[in-house]
From Swiss-Prot:
Gene3D superfamilies documented for this protein: Mur ligase, C-terminal domain, Mur-like, catalytic domain, NAD(P)-binding Rossmann-like Domain
Keywords noted in UniProt: ATP-binding, Cell cycle, Cell division, Cell shape, Cell wall biogenesis/degradation, Cytoplasm, Ligase, Nucleotide-binding, Peptidoglycan synthesis
Function: Cell wall formation. Catalyzes the addition of glutamate to the nucleotide precursor UDP-N-acetylmuramoyl-L-alanine (UMA).
Entry-linked Pfam families: Mur_ligase_C, Mur_ligase_M, MurD-like_N
Record's protein name: UDP-N-acetylmuramoylalanine--D-glutamate ligase
Subcellular location: Cytoplasm
Length: 461
């Protein structure tokens, strides 16, 4: 893909948009960045862009700016129904995303992981396993560095391990990972995609360019993910907690096993008891990583050692502290209902659950069966609070806390020794926080302010 002298517009100046703009400029393109945010809001990044000869359009998108380009690169946070994109698409102007741009230049082998939940943990674990096998590994995508920022350091003999979201997949065309993983597909981001069917279609783009030379790893226990097999040209491998798999990774008699082919011998990998991560969903994440790593040629011994040493990723069912016999867990990354369900299922009972944030057109009623005998009370926060309380009315005691600060204080004060205070919001964070990371950090700060106390001490009014 020749970029020198081409007029390229980058739409959206988030982390990936900024990285894409700088990459394009280094490759000789005439780059413009367009963002709906004001120049004041973008003041941190504008000077560096101008210094590199990149033009900046702030405070809105101009249709003429879009029409003057040879190529448009869309950041994942920008909806494809943005009016200016809809208009220029009619003229046949190429529109791709940052991941697709990177895929045209990335060297070496690619392992790409998507799913509604578990992406970050599985991606991080796969990276750790490949590093344990002394491979040259870069990890990025929807976590850490944008994919485009990995290009310059990529090597023909190396691996790029990528977490890829549905937003990123929407704008892919030739993105072809040698190994692709779909962990699960449950309703999420319906406010963006419009329907579950559209969301599934976006997820399935991860294997759209694959051939029979490539591998696709699917969750045999997840209906939507497993149905993807019928639409794939790839070699299919499976993972399952619940059944023996002919080709892939599975659990049998308390051990994780792997079978490379239907007629191959079964290889023992490690006992479930040696997985350091909490929750059945993390067994699935480990199974997916085991399958991917064996297909990448990593030995069972290296996989076992890496899994044993792996620790929970921040904001993902992260243990924060025990205060007065009460355990506090931060699962701020549980930004949808299915993720919250898996967090709740990780504990046998005694849960004081903090739910809420910005609604994503979710159905919280699916949590009702989990409440009896497991959740002592729900503390609602954010703009979704009223909807959550309506959906869970009568299933569990409900406390309208409003803010995370008050929710933590109320839950900490009500919990008894042996109980758990769990932040698993089932919502995005953007109504009260910059992102889920900030929400999780605030939760941890609120909890740790009480560390060392014999019992929870509520803040004074």
């Amino acid at each position: 893909m020749e970029l020198k002298g081409k007029k390229v517009l980058v739409v959206g100046l988030g982390k990936s948009g900024l990285a894409a703009a700088l990459f394009l400029r280094r490759r000789g393109a005439q780059v413009t960045v367009s963002d709906i945010r004001s120049a004041e809001a973008l003041s941190k990044d504008i000077p560096a862009l101008i210094e590199q000869g990149i033009a900046v359009e702030a405070g809105g998108h101009g249709l003429l700016t879009f029409r003057r380009q040879d190529l448009i690169v869309v950041s994942p946070g920008v909806p494809l129904d943005t009016p200016e994109l809809v208009q220029v698409r009619k003229f046949g102007l190429p529109i791709i995303g940052e991941v697709e741009l990177a895929a045209r230049f990335l060297k070496g082998k690619t392992l790409a992981i998507t799913g509604s939940n578990g992406k970050t943990t599985t991606t991080s674990l796969c990276g750790a396993i490949l590093e344990r096998a002394h491979q040259h590994v870069q990890v990025g995508g929807n976590i850490g560095l944008p994919v485009i920022a990995l290009v310059d350091d990529s090597r023909d003999d190396g691996w790029s391990v990528l977490e890829i979201s549905s937003f990123q997949l929407e704008t892919t065309e030739r993105f072809r990972p040698g190994i692709a993983v779909i962990l699960n597909i449950t309703p999420d981001h319906l406010d963006r995609h419009g329907s579950f069917e559209n969301y599934v279609a976006a997820k399935e783009r991860i294997f759209a360019a694959q051939t029979h030379d490539d591998a696709l790893i699917l969750n045999a226990d997840d209906d939507a993910a497993s149905r993807a097999a019928a639409r794939a040209s790839s070699r299919i491998f499976w993972f399952s907690r619940n059944r023996v798999i002919r080709q892939g990774a599975f659990v049998h008699e308390g051990n994780i096993l792997f079978r490379a082919a239907e007629d191959a011998a079964t290889e023992p990998i490690l006992p479930l008891s040696e997985i350091p991560l909490k929750g059945a969903h993390n067994v699935e994440n480990v199974l997916a990583a085991v399958c991917a790593a064996r297909l990448a040629g990593v030995s069972a011994e290296a996989i076992r050692d890496a899994v044993r040493d792996f620790r929970a990723v921040e904001h993902r069912l992260e243990f924060v502290a025990e205060i007065g016999g009460v355990s506090f867990y931060n699962d701020s990354k549980a930004t949808n209902v299915d993720a919250a369900r898996k967090a709740i299922e990780a504990f046998p009972g005694g849960i004081h659950l903090i739910l809420g944030g910005k609604d994503k057109n979710s159905d919280y009623r699916t949590l009702r069966p989990l409440m009896a005998g497991r959740v002592k009370a729900v503390y609602t926060i954010g703009s979704a609070a009223e909807k959550i309380m309506t959906h869970l009315d009568g299933a569990v005691p409900l406390i309208a806390a409003g803010t995370l600060d008050l929710a933590v204080n109320l839950a900490g004060g009500a919990a008894s020794p042996g109980d758990v205070v769990l932040l698993a919001p089932a919502c995005s964070s953007f109504d009260q926080f910059e992102n889920y990371e900030q929400r999780g950090q605030v939760f941890k700060d609120l909890v740790l302010a009480h560390r060392g106390a014999a019992a929870w001490q509520n803040a004074s009014a």
